[in-house]
UniProtKB/Swiss-Prot annotation:
Source organism: Ureaplasma urealyticum serovar 10 (strain ATCC 33699 / Western)
Protein name: Large ribosomal subunit protein uL15
NCBIfam families reported for this sequence: rplO_bact (TIGR01071)
Encoding gene per record: rplO
Molecular function GO labels: rRNA binding; structural constituent of ribosome
Record has Iron-sulfur as a keyword: no
Sequence segments annotated as region (Disordered): 1-42
Function comment: Binds to the 23S rRNA.
GO biological process: translation
Length: 148
């Protein structure tokens, strides 16, 4: 392939713009492909999605279903053990996590999850621990301290 041999792909340049309302010879003259009269023939004539002509629409006839527990669920700052490994302190307290932006929201309690090997003798303080995190902490000879 050379520059003087370049060609457009067959059929890629043949699409012509529809020129509506420019005479009956174009195939889209007079009513411009919109049919005769009526709301849909007007410039802003389309009805909104789910409009049923004034009848109460289906989404309002069918009752609301289900329950969402978001308002009542206990929310936590989730901290992974891997994110704690890089800090070389012996005590990883909640205050330490808030100050170092490991846990973002100070209003929420901290939950430690995940599995990583901590230096032995490290004390991790949090409000809650996952089973895997507790197992990893005990396997690496560190301590988990549950806060109230």
């Amino acid at each position: 392939m050379q520059l003087h041999n370049l060609e457009y792909k067959k059929g890629s340049r043949n699409h012509k713009e529809k020129r509506v309302g420019r005479g009956h010879g174009s195939g889209l003259g007079k009513t411009s492909g919109r049919g005769q009269d009526g709301q849909k023939a007007r410039k802003s004539g389309m009805v909104r999605l789910a409009f049923e002509g004034g009848q109460t629409p289906l989404y309002r006839r069918v009752p609301k279903v289900g329950f969402n527990n978001d308002r009542f669920a206990n929310k936590y700052n989730v901290v992974t053990l891997i994110s704690l490994v890089k800090y070389e302190t012996k005590e990883l307290t909640a205050e330490f996590m808030y100050v170092n932006k490991i846990a973002k929201n100070e209003d929420l309690p901290i939950k430690v999850i995940g599995n990583a090997v901590l230096p032995s003798g490290t004390v991790v303080s949090a409000h809650k621990f996952s089973k895997g995190a507790l197992e990893s902490i005990s396997n690496s000879k560190a301590k988990a301290q549950i806060l109230e």
